[in-house]
Structure formats: C-alpha cells, structure tokens
Amino acid sequence: VYTKLAKQAYPDLPVILGGLEASLRRFAHYDYWLDTVLPSIAEDSGADLISFGMGEHQTVEIARRLAAGEPVESITDVDGTCYLTDFDHLPEKYVECAGFRKVASDKVAYAKACRIQMDNQDVVSGQIIVQKQSEKYLVQNIPAKPLVRWELDKVYALPYTRRYHPIYESMGGVPAIREVQFSIIQNRGCFGGCNFCAIQLHQGRRVTSRSADSIVEEAERMTHEPDFKGYIHDVGGPTANFRFPSCREQMLRGMCTGGKHCLAPTTCSHMIVDHSDYLKILRRVRELPGVKKVFIRSGIRFDYLMADPDDTFFKELVEYHVSGQLKVAPEHCAPNTLAYMGKPPIETFNKFKDKFYELSKKAGKKQYLVPYLMSSHPGSTLKDAVYLAEYLYKNHMRPEQVQDLSLIHISEPTRLRCI
C-alpha cells in the first residue's frame, strides 16, 4: 500500500523493497490471512526492485549506481535482487518454476516450484530463477554472497544505542526490548533445514559467524551501559550452537539440494561437529568484569549437540548458561509428523532430555526444558496430535505455548501435504 502511494505521489522515484517481509514474498506465495495464493510482492506493490536476504551488499551497490545517475530500470544484474520484466528481456540462462496462475490452482505445481526456489538459494550452486506472474516475469538473480567474518565484525562494531526509537517513549516504551537489549548475535544462517522454516530462504543455509574478539568486545561495551545489570541474555543467532559451515564440501560445491538435510533423519557423515570455538567465546565473555551471567536463549540444536562426542560444552551449558529454563525445539513426537517437518526422531530428543536432567542434577541445579511444539503441520493427523498429548502427559510436560503453523514460504515436503 505505501509503495503504491509513494509511486502515485512521485512516479519517477525508485522504490526498492527489502527486509524479511519482502524477501519471503518475492515469488508467488500463499497468504495465511487471506487463505489464497498471491503473486510476487513486486507485482502487488509496484516496487522497482526487491532486495532479498540480509541485503548489505545489494544496498551499497544499488545506492552507488543510483547516485552515479544510472536509471533503476537498468539495474537488473545485482546479486540478491529480483525484478519484473517481459519475456523478450529475460536473461540468457535461467531455471523456470511454475507461474503464479499455475501454482495458485495446483498444489503439486506449487510444491515443485518451491523445490526449485529452495534449491537455488545457495551462493555457490544457485541459478537465476524465473517465474511468470500475472503478466510479467519475476527474475530472481543468484543470492548475494553472505558477509564474511571481517564484514560481520564491522557491522556489529557500529555504535548502536540498544534502545527503541524515542517516539515510543510516550507510549510507555517497548517492553520486549528487555530480552534483546543485552543479547549478542554471533552468527547468521542455519543448516538445520527444517521444512517449515523460512530462514534458509532469507539468511540461507550457509553459516557465517563473527570473530571471538568481536563478540567479546561487544560484551565488554555492554558492561558500560547504564541499564546493564550484569546479565547477558543471549549469545546466539538463528541456531545458537552453529559457528561454521556444516561440512567442507559445501564450501566447494554448495549446499546439498533435493531436500537433503544435514541433521535429519540422521546426522550426515560429512558434517563437522565441534563446539570448542563457541565454548571458548562463552568462557571469555563470562570472565569479563561486570558480567554476572551469560545465558543462551536463542535455541540450541539438540541433535547437533548430541552428535558431539565431547560433552564438555554440554556440561558447561548446563552449569553456566541456563537461566532456569532452556528452550529447545523437538516440535512434535509423532514419527510421521517429524518426517514431514524434516526433524530428527523423538528418540534423539529423549536422549538429550535425559542427559540434560542428569547433568543438571550433578551440577546441583533445578532446571527445566521448555519444548517448542507445533500444531497443524501439513501431514500431521489427529492421531499424531493424540500421540503428542500422551507423550507430554507421560513426560510431565506442560507447555504454555504451542505454535500453530502459519504458511508463508516453506519447502517441498511440507508443501506437498498442504490441503
């Protein structure tokens, strides 16, 4: 709506959409609230370009070229961007997925289109994707390269205020800021590859991370903030305990395609499992003067943790970094539903749960697990829901929150089971 109004007022003004909302709606997509399939947001909004992903490289390149006087219509070759064009101006090489009208009427076509889209979000192996909208064609260029370590360090060395905008002061502030004000982002991307998750379409499956010095320096700066009470709420990211790419092969050939997962249903034999670097960082941060506690709240991938033969990190996690409750995401317990989700079998979670309580007892701590659970996942049946209820009762779990799946952009196994 705002883009159309801006275009009406200033027809010659270039408009570039970015951020999570635009990124996840760059192709024809299902709208949860309207319960229908919509065309690309590029068509609905009238924007000139969509910058998908985190967007730093794209923003700088587009701004530089616009400042040099280049018309926005000719800026069609920037990695990490999408634009609309007609058939005669499509690039020479591309992979095409089913168009808007086809995917709006055929769920299998939608699922196959989604598979093509997901398989081409890797910076090494990704190709240009084309999808016909109502009239024009959406062209997605290959993804932009993720920021490398020194670039991430520069981004997080900027003088952020760690406060909400002053405009909210008269409204009583933003209570939710308390959880993130003194939290540290240490990585981007996630190779977990859950079928319902949109992170792989935005940040990608390739994990990049900040240097240890950058993270420790940010923590040290926090200790001088007037509101800091000694507690760092999180040192994490999309998945807290991922620091590096999942294997050496992905650096050369890109991420595996065709729905292959690094962790589910079993751990890939090529995956490198190592918590030592993350552990060293946490030790340095908790030793800083003025720091009382360092918590991990952004989610531990428990199957990755259980795949580590060295349990030093697990022991220190339990002893130093749990604020009484640790959030983890088994999501369900029924084998049928877990397979559709791309999650590990519940037996893996059970082993993790037992060890967590065992280590907590040895550490003299009364701590609990808070499981993330999901309802309404496509393919999940009423029988599966009953199975989950019985599992929770048997294991004395009383979750206060359960996520009801909201579809925006998810991968083929989930799509194929949408009604």
What are the functions of these language-model segments?
Residues 1-133, 140-141:
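Glycine-rich beta-alpha loop elements in corrinoid/cobalamin-binding modules
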Residues 13, 221-370, 374-378:
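Conserved SAM/AdoMet-binding glycine-rich loop
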Residues 48, 215, 328, 402:
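Conserved, mostly hydrophobic/aromatic
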Residues 73-92, 98, 118, 144, ...:
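Terminal amphipathic helices with adjacent charged low-complexity linkers/tails
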Residues 108-183:
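N-terminal [4Fe-4S]-dependent radical SAM core
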Residues 171-198, 231:
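N-terminal pre-triad scaffold of radical SAM enzymes
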Residues 378-393:
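Catalytic cores of alpha/beta
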Residues 406-419:
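Residue-level detector of conserved catalytic or cofactor/ligand-binding positions
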